[in-house]
Amino acid sequence: MIKKYEACFLFKSEELEYKVALEDVKKQLTAFNASDFVENSLGERALEYSIRKQSRGRYEIIEFKMDSSNLKELEVQLRLIKNLLRYMILVKINKKVNVKKVKRRNFREFKDNRDTREKELPESTADVKVD
């Protein structure tokens, strides 16, 4: 069954390594009969923690259509690409979701209630005398 996927790839930040790895990813996608490519580059960013001694990486998002039976083999081949640090492939769902509007809490009421409680506390402690 052909499904629409969205994949996020994290490559090494060096320009040459990035381009070579991106071409390898595209070759693997075409080898597994992926079609309708939409690419979006998020550019180079600092990583929260180092991955394979890399502190920066380039992000690339690719949307494509592919037969779901080929997904496992594609993931095996993606693991073999040397300069690909991480990847994540998600199934893109185009269903409309009914969102129920939620009533917002009125924080002013909460603050007013808290202020009245704070005023009551000192009065109750004033009755007790400490020697």
Curated annotation (Swiss-Prot):
Keywords for this protein: Ribonucleoprotein, Ribosomal protein, RNA-binding, rRNA-binding
GO cellular component: ribonucleoprotein complex; ribosome
GO biological process, one term: translation
CDD domains registered for this protein in UniProt: bS6 (cd00473)
An MF annotation (GO) of this entry: structural constituent of ribosome
Keyword match Ribosomal protein: yes
Family to which this protein belongs: Belongs to the bacterial ribosomal protein bS6 family.
HAMAP family documented for this protein: Ribosomal_bS6
Functional summary from the UniProt entry: Binds together with bS18 to 16S ribosomal RNA.
The name this protein goes by in its record: Small ribosomal subunit protein bS6
Upper taxonomic lineage: Bacteria, Pseudomonadati, Spirochaetota, Spirochaetia, Spirochaetales
Name of encoding gene: rpsF
